[in-house]
Every structure is written in structure tokens, then in C-alpha cells.
Design a protein with these regions (language model features):
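Amphipathic, Lys/Arg-enriched alpha-helical "gate/interface" segment within cytosolic domains
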Residues: 1-132
Length: 132
């Protein structure tokens, strides 16, 4: 069952070491901090074996520069906590894809990332390419 706070929701893909988050509309820094801590609390049991993260951004509004900075911090924390790959479901939004790519680059973590139209495509990629 998904945990929710404002525009953010977080859940685990059953039977997989994958955390899925989804955003709808406009978010803010407080919601993003909640999101980060919620994902970290779920994923802590997989730190040594590794886990993957899917961000469903397809229904989100673009983020502000300050919120983008919070997402960079989130990326660093997730990688430190054992996250092996980030998959982004961005629908048809080029702007969301560019923002996600820039935030990952700014994190300087070198984490594997993929960009897709749907969550299903992201899951298929994680199964076939990342093997978590």
C-alpha cells in the first residue's frame, strides 16, 4: 500500500527490490524531504544487496531550482543507501526528462539511469538491464 504526503506517494513493487514513487501536480521541498526519508526507511533493508528506484514523474509539474537542489540531495542519499539504478517515467514531457537528467548529473554519483514514457517500460528495463 502506498504511503502518501501531498503530491508525493511511495510504494514497493511486490516481490522486487524496487521503490516506486509518483508525483501528481506541484510538489514542494517539505514533501520532497518526506519522500526522501520515506524511501530511505523502506530501502534500508536492501542496503547491502542493492535496490532500484522508479520515479513516475509523468503527472508532475516541473520543479523550481530549489526543489531541484533537494532532488540532487535525494539522489546522493539514495546512492549512499545502496540504490543501483534510477528509472524515470516521464510520459511525453521533454522538460521533465531534461530536469531529471540534469539533477542526476548534478548529484555526481554516476548512478545508472534510464528515461521512459511509462512505469512499465521502466520496470522492463530494470529487469532486463539492471537485474535487481
Amino acid at each position: 500500500m502506498a504511503k502518501k504526503n501531498g503530491a508525493q506517494s511511495v510504494e514497493v513493487i511486490p516481490g522486487r527490490k524496487i521503490v516506486l514513487s509518483a508525483g501528481v501536480g506541484k510538489t514542494n521541498i517539505e514533501e520532497l524531504k518526506w519522500h526522501t526519508e520515506t524511501v530511505l526507511s523502506i530501502a534500508k533493508m536492501w542496503k547491502t544487496s542493492g535496490w532500484d528506484y522508479i520515479a513516475d514523474c509523468s503527472q508532475m509539474s516541473p520543479v523550481s531550482p530549489a526543489e531541484g537542489g533537494e532532488l540532487v540531495t535525494m539522489t546522493k542519499k539514495f546512492v549512499e543507501a545502496g540504490c543501483k539504478a534510477f528509472a524515470f517515467a516521464e510520459g511525453s514531457s521533454v522538460l521533465l526528462k531534461v530536469q531529471a537528467q540534469k539533477n542526476t548529473q548534478r548529484s555526481q554519483t554516476g548512478v545508472v539511469e534510464g528515461h521512459f514514457a511509462t512505469v512499465e517500460e521502466a520496470l522492463d528495463w530494470l529487469k532486463s538491464e539492471v537485474h535487481i
